[in-house]
Amino acid sequence: MARSFAIAVICIVLIAGVTGQAPTSPPTATPAPPTPTTPPPAATPPPVSAPPPVTTSPPPVTTAPPPANPPPPVSSPPPASPPPATPPPVASPPPPVASPPPATPPPVATPPPAPLASPPAQVPAPAPTTKPDSPSPSPSSSPPLPSSDAPGPSTDSISPAPSPTDVNDQNGASKMVSSLVFGSVLVWFMI
């Protein structure tokens, strides 16, 4: 558009320069009346074609956006049934207190055993005195007659010696007494 305008201006200047030169004629006495030189009408520049209207309007929206999917209906939770009331756990009874062991009575101090009564010492029985056997008188010799001055036999020698049965009785009696004493001591300890 600017180029066409510059070309038109150049053409106008050239035409004006050509027509403005004077003719080479001889001088006359009467000058010719000046001819009004009207410049030719300026060439009008070609009409600038208006640019076509820019139709950059956005295309009409033909398809409406799909409706947003409605959220799924919230399913109402089932009514919460109250949990069955469970009875509180029964507290287990405390363990039985261990009863103290029964106090055992202190052992009764047993008295020291009494020394056993020693059985009475057995009195040795007197040995029977045996008379020495006198030699039998010979038939030829006659026994001497006792003189009147010689003492007669004593009563001790004449008393009979204790028989063996008496000695046995004394031993049995002493054993019986000692066994009775020993038995009574045992019974006393048991009580």
From Swiss-Prot:
What are the GO cellular component annotations?
A: plasma membrane; side of membrane
Ranges of Polar residues composition bias in the record: 155-172
Q: How does it sit in the membrane?
A: Lipid-anchor; GPI-anchor
Q: Which UniProt keywords apply?
A: Cell membrane, Glycoprotein, GPI-anchor, Hydroxylation, Lipoprotein, Membrane, Proteoglycan, Pyrrolidone carboxylic acid, Signal
Give the signal peptide range.
1-20
Propeptide feature: residues:
173-191
The protein's matches in InterPro entries, at most eight in alphabetical order, are given as: AGP9/17/18 (IPR044981)
This chain is glycosylated at P26, P27, P31, P33
Start-end of Pro residues biased regions: 24-146
- PTM 4-hydroxyproline: at which residues? P23, P26, P27, P31, P33
The record's account of tissue expression is: Predominantly expressed in flowers and at a lower level in leaves and siliques.
Query: How is this protein named in the record?
Result: Classical arabinogalactan protein 9
